[in-house]
Design a protein with these regions (language model features):
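Catalytic alpha/beta active-site cores
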Residues: 1-271, 277-284
């Protein structure tokens, strides 16, 4: 949340809070203030405010040292009891993670170090439950070269090793898939203490194939004509998804998830069913 707020127009650039080419502490203050207001609105404290917190909270006997207005919003934590590295909270069954950095070990863009008085490094929000990876023809994958790149990226997502590097502010940044997040459960009546819980660090990914009417020059048939692109998509994207079955990094049920657009009536829907029947039969061989 901190990085997203800092780099967007959600935070005004007035009052010396411009984004600029280097880290601006005044803008950083506005980011922290916005985040505290967000927590006060969604995870309110009992007769207090997140703005008043000046140290990393602790957990005693499975219970949080901070008194929440609704204690059921405390889900779990990671780190040691006296040195939390994160808190897991929830609102409307969507989770909010607060990451702490009491020893200033995590990298920040501020040359002076973490300016958050409670040593909050970041706030992580549970986002969309699903994400569509688009292989459709209109924009995402127009020609054969686009298609191959799209398949390569999808394979990397299914293997869990896709990453990219770029420069920001003179520093090399690596973006890669988030690992699963491990927490210790908060104490609740009827449950043993210190049960471990795991949350997927990534949204569930679905692949949007093309509709039936398109062809693609990435594979040519014996007569020189282009392959029906929807059939190609079905076999390649599902085959790549098999890599995920062992790790369960995406599917919890050893499944591949396909979005099939632009079906014009029952005949085309039946043809889709026939395609995926063949895909499943070939995949289990």
């Amino acid at each position: 949340l901190y990085n997203a707020l800092y780099g967007s127009d959600v935070i005004s650039e007035t009052d010396d809070a411009s984004r600029g080419n280097k880290y601006n502490p005044e803008r950083g203050k506005k980011v922290i203030e916005y985040a505290r207001n967000f927590l006060d609105e969604n995870i309110p404290l009992f007769k207090s405010s997140w703005k008043d917190i000046s140290e990393v909270p602790k957990v005693y006997n499975g219970k949080l040292s901070l008194k929440l207005k609704d204690e059921k919003q405390f889900v779990g934590y990671s780190g040691t009891l006296n040195g939390l590295s994160s808190l897991l909270l929830k609102k409307n069954n969507l989770h909010i993670g607060i990451i702490f950095d009491p020893d200033n070990k995590l990298e920040v863009f501020n040359p002076e170090g973490n300016q958050d008085k409670a040593k909050v490094h970041d706030i992580i929000l549970e986002s969309a439950i699903t994400a569509i990876i688009d292989h459709e023809d209109s924009v995402a994958a127009v020609d054969a070269e686009d298609k191959v790149l799209g398949y390569k990226n999808w394979l990397g997502l299914m293997k869990g090793n896709l990453q990219t590097e770029f420069e920001k502010g003179g520093k090399k940044i690596i973006r890669k898939l988030n690992p699963d997040r491990i927490y210790t459960k908060s104490e609740k009546k009827g449950e043993p203490n210190f049960n471990e819980i795991k949350f997927h660090g990534r949204a569930l990914m679905l692949n949007r194939n093309v509709g039936h009417l398109m062809t693609n020059s990435s594979i040519l048939l014996k007569d020189g004509s282009e392959i029906p692109e929807g059939i190609l998509d079905a076999f390649i994207t599902v085959t790549a998804a098999i890599h995920d079955f062992k790790s369960k990094g995406n599917s919890r049920t050893n499944s591949g998830y396909i979005v099939k657009p632009k079906m014009h009536g029952p005949d085309e829907a039946a043809f889709t069913d026939l395609i995926f029947e063949h895909v499943e039969n070939e995949s289990v061989r």
